[in-house]
Amino acid sequence: MRPDRAARGRGPGALWAAPALLVLLAAGCRHPPQTAAAPATPPPDEPAPAAPAAPEASSGPIPVTELPAGGISEEDREFVLSHPPIYSENGQATWYVAPYKGRKAANGQVFRDDALTAAHRTLPMGSLIVVTNLTTHQASAMRISDRGPFVPGRSIDLTIASAKAIGLYRMGTAPVRIDVYQTPKPIETGGRWCVQIGAFKSQERAEKMKSALLRAYPRANVIEFSGEASFWVRIRPLGDSREEAERIVRRVRPTQGDAYLTRLD
């Protein structure tokens, strides 16, 4: 799915002139980008669970008191059971696999669908988290190893192993709570950031979008993903500043739609 977390993307900026932005809108945003579809739900061999309700706002960190053994190190398991989470959020989760299997994830390691890992746009790479399925109330610890999902309305993508661990595999998607227990870097400060825009099956269309963006954002670039929508355009602000990346998202999203603040480290 991704970049070199390079993907996951999650200097003082220059002032952009209004004419430059108008050129951008005219040249690059006539056609909505093609977005990657959610994975097909595997055929159930038992009655499928009822459709999940929309996720509620997080009521705050909730310590985990039980956690199945296996899949994560005993050290990680003991850390989660003996510490409160430092950050929590609610959102929608799904799982991903082929054609990502065998290719490098954003952390530079080969993607494994049997590992308890997940993709998130803004949590620091390597963060230790617990994901709880709010429909089945099953939970599992895992590590952030990739960037994404770059699909509207989704907060986190799980490997097949992670999805099975929380009862999400046959559901396809479900509301979840994400509790963060350990991060190699601060969540809210620092970091290197970019903005990912558009999802294209055609490299030619991605290059056209890049050309339009270059007029206002000289550091725009096209990157290739493993997936149905294989090409994305990424803008890196000067200094990889989060504040400037957020400003770019606000400028681009009203017309482009698929613009995602993404952490690189």
Walk through the language-model features, giving the residues of each.
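Extracytoplasmic
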Residues: K201-D265
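Secreted/periplasmic proteins
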Residues: R2-R5, G9, C29-C194, A199-Q203, ...
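Sec-dependent N-terminal signal peptides
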Residues: R10-L22
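Generic alpha-helix initiation/capping and coil-helix boundary signal
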Residues: P19, I86-Y87, L238
